[in-house]
C-alpha cells in the first residue's frame, strides 16, 4: 500500500527526524507506528547519502548533527507484549516504502531463542517491556542499539520499577531515543519524571526525582508521626505550566479530535438500583470491609484493597476468604441482557473480575460468547463473526485494532485507571471506524461504581481523586 501521510503525520515524522531524543504524545489512531518507521526510513536514507558524500560542494560537512553521523539502525523497539508480537512487523508489511526494512520480533520467546534472534543482524528488533532487565544484563556494557523506541513510554512512569532502573543504565549510549504514548499522565504529573528522564537524563525536570518533587510539588497526604508522604499535589497552578514549558522542545502533543474526522462517540451511563434487601446486604458488607481499615491513616494501598471488594459487590459477586464465589445480585447481568436483546450489532464487553467473566458466559451461553485472546479470535471479531466478545481492559491495550468488528462497548465494571479506560475504548473508537461508537457503562447507584465515574472524569491528580472518593465513602458509611 502506498503511504500518503496526513499533515499531522508529516509533523510527527519531521519532529522525530529533527530531534535526537523526543517524545510524541499522540492520541490513539494518529499513526504513531507508521510515522516512526517512516522517520527511521528517512534517517537511514539520509545517513547513506551523507556517508557517500560526506562533504558538500561548498566544502562543509554534510553531517550537521552528531546523531546523523550514525545510522538509526540497529534499532530496538520496546513495547507491550501484544504490540511487540505483531504490530511492528505487520506495519512494515503493510506499506510499500517500508517493506525493505528488516524487522524481527523477539517477544514471547524463550531466553535461548531470544538470544539467538538478538545475535542475528536485523534493522529493528522488537521486544516486550517485561524483558528489559534481562536484555540490559544480556548486553552488559556492549549496548548495540543506535536508536531505542519506547512504544508506550508511560510503561516507564515508575522510577522504582526494574524496567526503568535497568534501561536508565544504558540508554545514554543510544544516539536516538523516541518515546511514544497517548497517555503520558495516567495518574498525574509525577508520572512524567522518569519518562522524560529516559530522554534527557534529567536535564529538564531535574537530575533526581527528589529534586523534581521539591521543585514542583508539595505533600498532600502525610503520616505526621512517621513523616511518610503518601501523595503529592502540584505546588501551584503555575507548576503545570513550568513543567509543560520545560519539556516543550522535545515533546510533541497532538489530539485525535483536532486532526481526525471521526464518527461520534457516545458515553451512556446506565444507572442501576439494587432492591432494598440486596442494597441492605451491600451496605452491611461495605461497612464490614471499611471497618477493617485504619480510617485515621488511609493510604492508597488500603483504599485499593477495600475498593476491590466493593467493586466486586457492585458487579454482583465476591470472593470469600477461601476463594469461593459468593453470589450477591444479578442487576448488571439483567441490564446486560436488555442491551444484548435491543442491540443489532456485535458487542464488546469489558469485564473486571474472573467471576464477572464466568457469570456473563453462563448467562449468554446460547450466543457462544468468545474471549478475545488468540489471533484467530481477533480475526473472527473483525470479520463480524462474534456476536458477544469479552475482554479484560488490561488485555485490550496498545496496538489492538478491533474497529472493524463492531461499534458497541459495554463496561460491566469500570476500571479506576484513566489510561486503561481510554486505551480500551480506543480499540473500537479509532481511525477506520465507520460508525458512531456507543459506550454503555453499567453503574449501580450508591456503590463504588459512582466513585469510579467521578475519578475517571476528574481533572485532579488521579491518585488524589481516588483517595478523596474513598474517604467520602468511608465518612458516609461510619
Describe these PLM feature segments.
Residues 1-25:
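Conserved pre-motif I regulatory segment
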Residues 83-109, 199-202:
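Conserved helix-turn-beta segment of the N-terminal RecA-like "Helicase ATP-binding" lobe
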Residues 72-94, 186-191, 353:
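Conserved Walker A/P-loop ATP-binding site and its immediately adjacent core
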Residues 1, 18, 31, 35-47, ...:
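Conserved Helicase C-terminal RecA-like lobe
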Residues 67, 72-74, 120, 147, ...:
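Conserved P-loop NTPase motor "coupling/switch" region that bridges the ATPase
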Residues 133-137, 187-189, 356-359, 378-382, ...:
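SF2 helicase motor core recognition
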Residues 110-145:
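Conserved helix/coil segment N-terminal to the catalytic DExD/H
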Residues 416-478:
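A conserved SF2-helicase RecA2
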Amino acid at each position: 500500500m502506498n503511504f500518503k501521510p496526513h499533515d499531522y503525520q508529516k509533523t510527527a515524522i519531521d519532529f522525530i527526524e529533527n530531534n535526537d531524543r523526543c517524545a510524541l504524545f499522540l492520541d490513539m489512531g494518529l499513526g504513531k507506528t507508521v510515522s516512526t518507521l517512516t522517520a527511521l526510513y528517512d534517517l537511514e536514507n539520509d545517513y547513506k547519502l551523507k556517508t557517500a558524500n560526506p562533504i558538500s560542494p561548498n566544502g562543509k560537512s554534510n553531517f550537521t548533527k552528531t546523531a546523523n553521523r550514525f545510522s538509526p539502525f540497529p534499532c530496538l523497539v520496546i513495547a507491550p507484549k501484544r504490540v511487540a508480537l505483531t504490530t511492528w512487523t505487520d506495519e512494515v508489511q503493510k506499506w510499500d516504502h517500508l517493506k525493505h526494512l528488516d524487522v524481527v520480533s523477539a517477544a514471547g520467546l524463550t531466553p535461548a531463542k531470544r538470544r539467538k534472534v538478538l545475535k542475528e543482524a536485523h534493522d529493528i528488533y522488537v521486544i516486550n517491556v517485561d524483558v528489559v532487565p534481562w536484555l540490559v544484563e544480556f548486553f552488559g556494557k556492549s549496548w548495540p542499539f543506535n536508536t531505542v523506541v519506547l512504544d508506550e513510554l508511560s510503561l516507564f512512569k515508575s522510577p522504582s520499577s526494574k524496567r526503568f532502573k535497568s534501561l536508565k543504565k544504558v540508554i545514554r549510549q543510544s544516539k536516538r531515543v523516541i518515546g511514544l504514548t497517548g497517555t503520558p499522565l495516567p495518574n498525574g504529573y509525577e508520572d512524567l519524571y522518569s519518562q522524560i528522564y529516559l530522554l534527557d537524563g534529567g536535564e529538564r525536570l531535574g537530575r533526581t526525582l527528589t529534586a523534581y518533587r521539591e521543585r514542583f510539588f508539595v505533600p498532600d497526604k502525610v503520616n505526621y508521626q512517621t513523616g511518610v508522604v503518601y501523595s503529592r499535589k502540584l505546588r501551584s497552578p503555575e507548576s503545570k505550566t513550568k513543567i509543560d514549558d520545560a519539556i516543550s522542545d522535545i515533546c510533541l502533543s497532538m489530539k485525535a479530535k483536532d486532526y481526525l474526522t471521526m464518527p461520534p462517540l457516545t458515553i451512556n451511563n446506565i444507572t442501576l438500583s439494587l432492591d432494598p434487601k440486596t442494597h441492605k446486604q451491600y451496605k452491611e458488607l461495605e461497612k464490614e470491609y471499611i471497618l477493617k481499615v485504619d480510617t485515621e491513616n488511609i493510604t492508597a494501598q488500603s483504599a485499593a484493597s477495600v475498593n476491590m471488594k466493593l467493586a466486586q459487590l457492585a458487579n454482583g459477586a465476591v470472593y470469600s476468604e477461601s476463594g469461593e464465589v459468593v453470589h450477591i445480585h444479578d442487576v448488571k447481568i439483567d441490564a446486560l441482557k436488555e442491551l444484548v436483546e435491543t442491540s443489532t450489532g456485535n458487542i464488546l464487553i469489558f469485564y473486571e473480575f474472573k467471576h464477572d467473566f464466568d457469570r456473563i458466559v453462563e448467562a449468554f451461553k446460547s450466543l457462544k460468547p468468545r474471549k478475545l485472546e488468540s489471533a484467530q479470535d481477533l480475526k473472527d471479531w473483525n470479520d463480524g463473526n462474534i456476536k458477544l466478545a469479552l475482554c479484560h481492559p488490561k488485555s485490550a491495550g496498545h496496538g489492538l485494532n478491533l474497529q472493524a468488528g463492531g461499534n458497541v462497548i459495554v463496561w460491566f465494571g469500570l476500571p479506576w485507571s484513566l489510561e486503561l479506560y481510554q486505551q480500551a475504548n480506543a480499540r473500537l473508537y479509532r481511525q477506520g471506524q465507520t460508525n458512531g461508537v456507543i459506550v454503555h457503562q453499567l453503574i449501580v447507584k450508591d456503590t463504588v461504581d459512582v466513585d469510579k465515574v467521578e475519578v475517571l472524569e476528574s481533572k485532579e491528580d488521579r491518585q488524589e481523586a481516588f483517595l478523596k472518593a474513598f474517604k467520602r465513602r468511608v465518612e458516609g458509611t461510619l
